[in-house]
Every structure is written in C-alpha cells, then in structure tokens.
Amino acid sequence: MAREQYVSQVQLLVRSLPYIGEEKAFALKGGTAINLFYRDLPRLSVDIDLTYLPVKPREESLWDIDETLDRIGSNISQHLRGAKIRRIAGGGGNETRLEVSQGATVIKVETSPVARGSVHPVDVRTVSEKVEDEFGFAAMQILSFEDLFGGKLHAAVDRQHPRDLFDVKLLYANEGFTDALFRTFLIYVASSGRPPHELLAPSITDIEATFRQEFEGMTVEPVKLEDLLEVRRRGYSPTFVTSWMFTRERFSCRYTTVNPISTLSDFRKPRAFQR
C-alpha cells in the first residue's frame, strides 16, 4: 500500500480518537497506542485496537460493548463531516468492530469480547509531539507499558506480523525486556485462545508477502525484511529457545494450579535477555 494511503488513514484515525476517548470503559492498546502515544511516530498505524476494561460477566460485558460502540459510531458520524459508520463482525462472530470511512479512506475500531480487563492500571496520555504537529491533538486512556508490550510480544509470537516485529525491534533497542514485562506477557499467554506451548515455541511462518503488502511504506526510516527476520531469529536463537523451554515447562505446570496467575510473581525473563 502506498504511504499516502497510510497517511490518510492516520489522519482519520486521529480525528476519530476524541470521540472514542470519551468512553472510559475502553483503553487504547496495540500499534496505535505504541507508535502515536508512547513513541514519536516511528511508524504509521491505521487501526484502533481497544481493551474493554470492566471485569463483568460475559453477557453483561457484551451488552455494554455493543452499547458503547454504538455511541462511538454515532458521535463520529455526527461530528466528522462525511464519515460513515458500519458495524462488522469481530471475534466470536459478535459485531465488536466499527468500520469508519471518509471518502476512500477506511479504518477499523475493534475490541475483543474475550480478552477483557488489564493487568496493570491504565494511563491517560496525549499523542506525541510529532503526531500533534502532523495530525492534530488527541488524548486517551492507554494501557500501561507492561500491558502494551506484553500484548505486543504475545501478538508477535502469535501472528509474526511485520508490524508487530517492528514494534518489538524498538522495544529491544530502547526499554528492553524486563522481568515485569515478561510476567505480564505470560499472563497474556495464559489468557490466549491458543495453547501456551504453541506460543512459547511457535512455528516459523513466511512473512515476505505480508511485509510487501501490509508494512512497506509505514516507517519513517526504511526497514528491510531482513531486519525483522533478525528480530525473530533473536527470539528463536538456541540460547533463547533453551530458556523459553525451561520457562514453558515451569509455566505449564503452574498453569494447572487453582490460581495460575498468582503463581507468576517469581518468573524472570529468559537468560538471552539478561543484561
């Protein structure tokens, strides 16, 4: 996709954020939270991923999500000239996504009806200075650093999408892989719909076509496919895999206990990431 199209999507995304931010049941997560709020726009991000924060029974949560998305869609269509809203199916067949279009530009707003709540308290942040200069101001509830990047690490091993690998690349280059982050990542693994062993020792997938079609043109600085493959290789190096395997065995045993989440406090990051 051409960079111009990505830019127009970010413009629509930033214009939509104030109406989403009014709903305190949601916090922003994923690439948009990382690259527009936490970092100074190293890459463009074109979807709005939300975490539903209240921890309530499933049916009550689904009803509230439905009502809240309706309010968001109504506010956007009323305040953004030419904006059109369409509810579309998300996880589990529920209509937990909004498609927001303005002319030829389309973005998606979505939340998971399954993965609800956060591990750590949320923050209220404003977009970075560069984002404000180029696209305008926005402020919103954002997941904590550990939740943001714990979820991002989970996405990286689950999907191996170039966007996720790029975000992990900058994590390695900046904050690094802390014990608190690793424990939060394990909680996301435990909450996943996939078996933990598949995420702690994933199979390699071919990402070249996805890189060309869904990533090239998004970053400020040019990024080669090999750069992202190196991030993945680092994660699957012999030292790292050995550490993962040890962690996986301990984690799998702990996960069968009555209260698995409370047993994660003594887990440490793999030795490959010790500084």
Q: Where on the chain are the PLM-derived regions?
A:
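Compositionally biased terminal segments of proteins
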Residues: M1-R275
